[in-house]
Regions:
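Alpha-helical transmembrane segments and their membrane-interface exit regions
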Residues: 40-48, 90-99, 141-150, 192-202
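Cytoplasmic-side transmembrane-helix entry/capping segments in multi-pass membrane proteins
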Residues: 57-65, 87, 108-116, 160-164
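Alpha-helical membrane-embedding segments
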Residues: 65-79, 96-101, 119-130, 147-152, ...
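Membrane-helix interface and helix-disruption motif detector
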Residues: 23-38, 74-90, 125-140, 179-189
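Membrane-interface capping segments at transmembrane-helix boundaries
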Residues: 202-212
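Alpha-helical transmembrane segments
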Residues: 8-20, 61-69, 113-121, 167-171
Length: 212
């Protein structure tokens, strides 16, 4: 019963506040600033309702749709000539997808499929919206850690993870160096630092066993 009262209070409070903000906005200025507090207020009753039902899947779906709608609105108001909201779609859509997949979301195959889809999406976006610079390598670098960490975490191959992770970092910095400033070789500095990761794993793990 208390949860019902909490939801009713959240719903009534949100509606009253949104109406008040819209009225104040219409009386003070022509700029629709009311959308910012309205966006936050809409999350309140929805969060309370989903918590009551213990339905995290519904929460992820509705929250993602509201955030996407907010970004589309903000994009249309501020810079309608450039659809920047498209950059935020993959992580926002991944949330409900992984929530719906439930236990299957922990599989390495799911991580590989989702990562490949996200990377492919950003490559396509890169080629269509801004082909001048291959910026897709940045989100690709971040996303590749997902299946990599999941696989080595499940197999408990931590030393192999340090090697494969180091190779990924080395490849990333080498690519960024070659693309942005090919006449100045600066990638050796972060590469030197990352090499300490597998080196320390080797001496701490394997050498420790030999000493024991």
């Amino acid at each position: 019963m208390k949860k019902d009262i909490a939801f009713q209070f959240a719903l009534a409070g949100s509606i009253m506040t949104i109406i008040f903000i819209i009225v104040v906005n219409s009386l003070s200025t022509t700029y629709p600033w009311f959308i910012y507090p309205t966006f936050a207020l809409l999350l309140w009753p929805i969060g309370v309702f989903c918590a009551k039902k213990k339905n995290h899947k519904l929460l992820s779906i509705v929250y993602s749709l509201i955030i996407i709608a907010f970004l589309v609105t903000e994009n249309y108001i501020q810079t309608p000539e450039y659809p920047w909201f498209l950059y935020a779609l993959p992580p926002l859509l991944c949330w409900p997808v992984l929530a719906i997949l439930d236990k299957h979301s922990k599989k390495v195959s799911t991580a590989i499929l989702c990562s490949a889809s996200i990377i492919g999406y950003y490559i396509m976006l890169n080629l269509i919206l801004s082909p001048q610079h291959p910026w897709a390598i940045y989100p690709a670098f971040a996303v590749l850690w997902w299946p990599l960490a999941l696989y080595h975490g499940k197999t408990r191959t931590f030393y192999a993870f340090s090697i494969s992770g180091s190779l990924l970092v080395i490849a990333f910095f080498a690519a960024v160096n070659a693309i942005t400033t090919p006449d100045h070789i600066w990638a050796v500095y972060p590469i030197f630092c990352i090499l300490w990761w597998p080196l320390s794993m080797y001496y701490y793990g394997f050498k420790k066993k030999k000493i024991a």
